Regions:
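Short, small/polar-rich loop/turn modules that mediate ligand/substrate recognition or access, typified
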Residues: 12, 96, 101, 158-160
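Substrate-binding pocket helix/loop in short-chain dehydrogenase/reductase
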Residues: 22-23, 30-32, 124-128
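Active-site helix of classical SDR
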Residues: 46, 80, 88
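Alpha-helical segment proximal to the catalytic Tyr-Lys
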Residues: 51, 93-97, 156
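Residue(s) in the substrate-gating loop at a strand-loop-helix junction
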Residues: 64
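Short C-terminal tail/terminal secondary-structure segment
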Residues: 69, 148, 159-173
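A conserved structural motif in NAD(P)-dependent oxidoreductases
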Residues: 132-143, 154
């Protein structure tokens, strides 16, 4: 990146994976797999990105409602997303003096390829359709617009925050 472009302005940590099982069926390898892909990628990816942000920049993590709410079989993913949100706050403070803003965007139920792996996918989507105060499900474009705002100059004074994009669903759960 430095050779080709000279610097990096934006880093979005969107790596995600996980093992969907009840707590008592989890193995250490499930935990390690999920934490390494989700939380570890955010921390070490952000470290490397920050080294290339000589003139400041923006770092955005991606989380989900499972970080703050119980979702069936979502333990490893939910905990890893909570770790991303915590890492966001630490990075925001420690990178502020370099002019780097760090935030996370957290989404409600999105009909993505990842959701196809959930055994209760249809139930989750039906719940989102029926119970989201905004009257519709969150779309990928809603998440993209929020991330685009977070990397814009308009968000310069937003630091260390997790912006929940769920149409209000999490406040009525």
């Amino acid at each position: 990146i430095r050779e080709e472009f000279g610097r990096l302005d934006v880093f979005v940590s969107n790596a995600a994976s996980g093992v969907l099982r009840p707590v008592m069926e989890l193995e250490e390898s499930h935990w390690d797999w999920t934490m390494n892909i989700n939380a570890k990628a955010m921390l070490f990816g952000a470290q490397e990105a920050a080294k290339l942000m000589d003139k400041g920049g923006k770092i955005v993590g991606v989380s989900s409602l499972g970080s703050i709410r119980y979702l069936e079989n979502y333990t490893t993913v939910g905990v890893s997303k909570a770790a991303i949100e915590s890492i966001t706050r630490y990075l925001a403070v420690e990178l502020a003096q370099k002019g780097i803003a760090v935030n996370t965007v957290s989404g409600g139920a999105l009909d993505t390829d990842a959701l196809k792996h959930f055994p209760n996918r249809e139930e989750l989507l039906d719940d989102a359709r029926k119970n989201t105060p905004a009257g519709r499900m969150v779309e990928i474009e809603d998440m993209v617009k929020t991330a685009m705002f977070l990397i814009s100059d308009d968000s310069d004074m937003i630091r260390g925050q997790t912006i929940i994009v769920d149409g209000g669903r999490s406040i009525v759960m």
